[in-house]
Amino acid sequence: MNEKITESRFKIKAKNIIAIASGKGGVGKSTFAVNFAVTLKNLGYSIGILDADIYGPSVPRMMGISDKPVTNDNNKLVPLINYGVKCMSIGFLIEESTPAIWRGPMVMKALEQMFNGVEWGELDYLIIDLPPGTGDAQLTLAQSSKLSGSIIISTPQDIALLDAIKGINMFNKVNVPVLGIVENMSYFICNNCKQKHEIFSNGGAKKESEKFNIPFLGEIPIDIDLRIKSDEGKPFCISEIKNDISEIYISIAKKIADKT
């Protein structure tokens, strides 16, 4: 891991800032971001997760946090902590059912506040759960926070892969390294026959990684317990450390730690 502290217009001290991105919604990006963060914490790193998905914040629910952040003597918000991970999300500041009906400039101001107006302290890794797509928020964060790299999350379907490619191209244009691509919902293991079923096709993300010369980080299967734990606010990689899926996350986290 690099020892250099990253500082930027969005002022935060972190040795590595990694964006978790997807070209479209519904591919499990936030689920990956949360479990990736707690896995890095389990490996001994100091971790923060910033929920940059202003319009659809998921981190509060997935991390099991319902409290509101307080302000310290420096007039900065103190991140909320669960499972040893520092967390900040617009979802902590508005009611869960209240939509953020904001235009671009207000979104940018909110994102800057979550960087500069939060007492993050020094971190080994800040994980940013980006909103889906390739719009203003993604570009601003990529250009203003000096990202160490990004991880692209996709499902095997062709339409998801097409949008993932757009994300790869965006990061290439703003000179942010793509550290790898993950194929989520890659397959399903039947509880009865124990056979592997590739419901949404399989292997597309790996083919795209080879085409773009990007590391393929791994395949994560569909698992009902993963969904249940997310809804309960208990990240799967905390509650089921010895599960096969947790081992996949550990493998991915170690690959990223070796690169950064």
Specify the residue positions occupied by each region the protein language model found:
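Conserved catalytic-core segment of NTP-binding enzymes
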Residues: 124-125, 131-229
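Walker A/P-loop phosphate-binding motif and the immediately C-terminal alpha-helix
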Residues: 16-51, 168
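Glycine-rich phosphate-binding loops of nucleotide-dependent enzymes
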Residues: 88, 111, 130, 143, ...
